């Protein structure tokens, strides 16, 4: 980035960065490191595939909203709630940590939203949030992780016992 800024006439240092976290195939970044070292005023973590990260300690430090505020920065995290939590298709959330100008934020938000919202989508985000509130949300995520681990172990066991082409 520094090289490109220097090579570009009239360019100034960026003030905003967008980081895809996690990637579609499950790659997470150390968001604490990014927040503390990336020299920009605001960072947007596009966390479309991982709206569940704040509900399990195994993801601590891997989500945009992990940890406290970052001095002098605004952190945004967007999540496609419909992908992995119980919300209707197209439902998503924007999380903000840090000091923002609410009028400017709301103006930008309203520019990209409908004047005729489909209220069942809005209600489904509220329902998804309520389902994940407190210990219930943590328990749901813990059970999902436990099932995924058991499934992987069972597939591994079946592969070790099989001569079938299915596992090749």
Language model segments and positions:
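Conserved PLP-enzyme active-site core in the AAT-like
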Residues: 1-159, 163
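Low-complexity, serine/threonine/proline-enriched polar segments
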Residues: 166-168
